């Protein structure tokens, strides 16, 4: 029973991998057809409706003041980061965009957690390294040399994701549903303001609305289970395992968009799979 409980945080994190990976695949597709900030705002609306309804139906207790503030800060950072990430993906220069955002987003919280909660152990560290290598190899492409156009946005997105992880962890053991709902409200406020003041508001075709709605449901689902993983386990474990989401994005792109699956990506998949038991154990 104890062994089963030990793997529950990892199970939550890997569920987030599936949800976030699928959401980012849809985000990359949808953000090519409409302004990235507008698309992200629609994603946030969809997610907020779902998580808000769940929180109300389950009667989950509303967070205290401290948890509420941290949730709002996390949502603001995460909302901007997601919009920048979608815009970077939509730029078409993905050679470094996805791995930079994912690895940077995981590395910063991992370092902070090591100082705050202590050294995680050599086995976990080896798993972190393998996961980082795996994410990089899975996400990178062979195309192009020089500096990709989306690199700066990818760096900012990675820093924003790191800030989201760290702040959402500070919300403590408050209801994951309400923490997710509050953070998503802040994310919508930020991205919605950018859309309105930046004059990005446009009519959106029904298929794109559908893509954004599904992406929003998947994204908020990943956020909820990530919050639970970080609440019952170490933040660095939850962040590093969850950062493997590009593997799902790449597999979906291979299946539906027939993108090339290189030898480097295969090696990255193996490294990522090998990292899971090291981090979870």
Residue ranges, per PLM feature:
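Hydrophobic transmembrane alpha-helices of multi-pass small-molecule transport proteins
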Residues: 46, 51, 107-111, 120-140, ...
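Residue-level recognition of transmembrane alpha-helices
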Residues: 17, 40-44, 98-102, 124, ...
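Specific alpha-helical transmembrane segments that line the substrate/conduction pathway
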Residues: 71-79, 86-132, 180-186, 235-255
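Alpha-helical transmembrane segments of MFS and MFS-like solute carriers/permeases
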Residues: 12-15, 70-73, 77, 130, ...
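C-terminal appended segment following the main domain
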Residues: 229-281
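Membrane-interface interhelical linkers
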Residues: 1-19, 26-72, 82-92, 141-152, ...
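Hydrophobic alpha-helical transmembrane segments in multi-pass integral membrane proteins
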Residues: 51-61, 109-124, 160-177, 219-236, ...
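Hydrophobic/small/kink-forming positions within alpha-helical transmembrane segments
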Residues: 17, 21, 25, 49-52, ...
């Amino acid at each position: 029973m104890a062994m089963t409980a030990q793997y529950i945080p990892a199970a939550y994190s890997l569920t987030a991998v599936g949800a976030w990976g699928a959401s980012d695949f849809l985000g990359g597709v949808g953000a090519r057809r409409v302004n990235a900030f507008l698309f992200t705002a629609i994603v946030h609306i969809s997610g907020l409706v779902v998580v808000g309804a769940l929180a109300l139906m389950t009667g989950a207790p509303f967070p205290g003041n401290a948890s509420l503030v941290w949730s709002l800060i996390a949502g603001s950072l995460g909302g901007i980061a997601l919009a920048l990430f979608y815009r970077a993906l939509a730029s078409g220069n993905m050679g470094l965009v996805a791995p930079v955002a994912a690895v940077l987003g995981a590395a910063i919280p991992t370092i902070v957690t090591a100082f705050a909660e202590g050294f995680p152990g050599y086995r976990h560290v080896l798993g972190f390294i393998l996961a980082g290598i795996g994410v990089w190899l899975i996400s990178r492409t062979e195309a192009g040399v020089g500096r990709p156009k989306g690199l700066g946005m990818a760096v900012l997105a990675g820093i924003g994701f790191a800030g989201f992880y760290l702040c959402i962890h500070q919300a403590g053991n408050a209801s994951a549903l309400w923490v997710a709902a509050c953070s998503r409200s802040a994310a919508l406020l930020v991205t919605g303001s950018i859309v309105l003041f930046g004059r990005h508001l446009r009519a959106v075709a029904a298929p794109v609305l559908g893509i954004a709605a599904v992406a929003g449901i998947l994204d908020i689902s990943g956020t909820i289970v990530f919050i639970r993983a970080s609440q019952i386990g170490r933040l660095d474990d939850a962040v590093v395992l969850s950062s493997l989401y590009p593997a799902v994005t790449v597999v979906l792109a291979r299946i539906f968009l027939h993108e090339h699956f290189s030898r480097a990506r295969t090696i990255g998949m193996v490294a990522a799979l090998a990292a899971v038991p090291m981090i979870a154990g």
